[in-house]
Amino acid sequence: MLSAFKLDNCRLSRLELDDSDDLTASIWVDLIEPEDDEREKVQTELGQSLATRPELEDIEASARFFEDEDGLHIHSFFFFEDADDHAGNSTVAFTIRDGRLYTLRERELPAFRLYRMRARNQTLVDGNAYELLLDLFETKIEQLADEIENIYSDLESLSRIIMEGRQGDEYDDALSTLAEQEDVGWKVRLCLMDTQRALNFLVRKARLPSGQLEQAREILRDIESLLPHNESLFQKVNFLMQAAMGFINIEQSRIIKIFSVVSVVFLPPTLVASSYGMNFEFMPELRWSFGYPGAIVLMILAGLAPYLYFKRKNWL
């Protein structure tokens, strides 16, 4: 999908791409999984070549932050959650050339959607491509900060469940959620660090206007303040994991102790029975017509009763 935006009194407005000359008035060209004809339209009208999928997936710094005859290029991770609430990072290719920002991505992203909503009423200060780029990065950092707050909130709820130590389905779900939160926290950290690298490259290599230079440094300070919070999340998750494993080990030791006591209690009767073999001359049950089926039923009950009891106690 191809979208283009122009400046109208320092505000972004979407261009209707019906006429062939529309792209030349744009300040921001946004492409999501572009078709071949959309790539050709950008190449023909603006003379801009776009990154390919292998180039988007390359993680080497030299392939993610560079400048050539086609402009200034930055490939940066953006955090998202899919329809199944699985977290991930998707690479967005930014290119700035001739005062125009190009963005190429594989999917719709929350930061872009939020920025487009804000841009309807937000006035740009300087109205240049660098300001658009930094505004998108700023929106991304706000989203990551919100995600860190959500993880903190979830960990508080999980902490109460785990520290109570009452194992069951809720406890198992808590451990599963804890592992998921660790994965989300790791992806947030990866996104923060990647954005930090991108901004450092932008500050060093690009000739930013003074307003955008200060904006970039402000975002870097925000990232520096968020990274320790993100690190504390891993410490909290690690503590809860160790606490959960400790409670599980204690519960397992208690169950093993009960099994050991039961085994010891029944060992002497078993020893006596095995020594004598129950070979007595006077055994009334031998002449009882229901002796055999009665013994079968008794054996079944003797095996079923402890099983049901252990199952009720969640020992099995």
UniProtKB/Swiss-Prot annotation:
Q: Which InterPro entries match?
A: CorA_cytoplasmic_dom, CorA_MIT, CorA_TM1_TM2, Mg/Co-transport_prot_CorA, MgTranspt_CorA/ZnTranspt_ZntB
Parts of the chain that traverse the membrane: 258-278, 290-310
Main location group: membrane
Question: Where, per UniProt, does this protein localize?
Answer: Cell inner membrane
Q: Does the keyword Cell membrane apply?
A: yes
Q: Which GO terms describe its cellular component?
A: plasma membrane
Q: Which GO terms describe its molecular function?
A: cobalt ion transmembrane transporter activity; magnesium ion transmembrane transporter activity; nickel cation transmembrane transporter activity
Keyword annotations: Cell inner membrane, Cell membrane, Ion transport, Magnesium, Membrane, Transmembrane, Transmembrane helix, Transport
User: This protein is called what?
Assistant: Magnesium transport protein CorA
Source species? Pectobacterium atrosepticum (strain SCRI 1043 / ATCC BAA-672)
Taxonomic lineage: Bacteria, Pseudomonadati, Pseudomonadota, Gammaproteobacteria, Enterobacterales
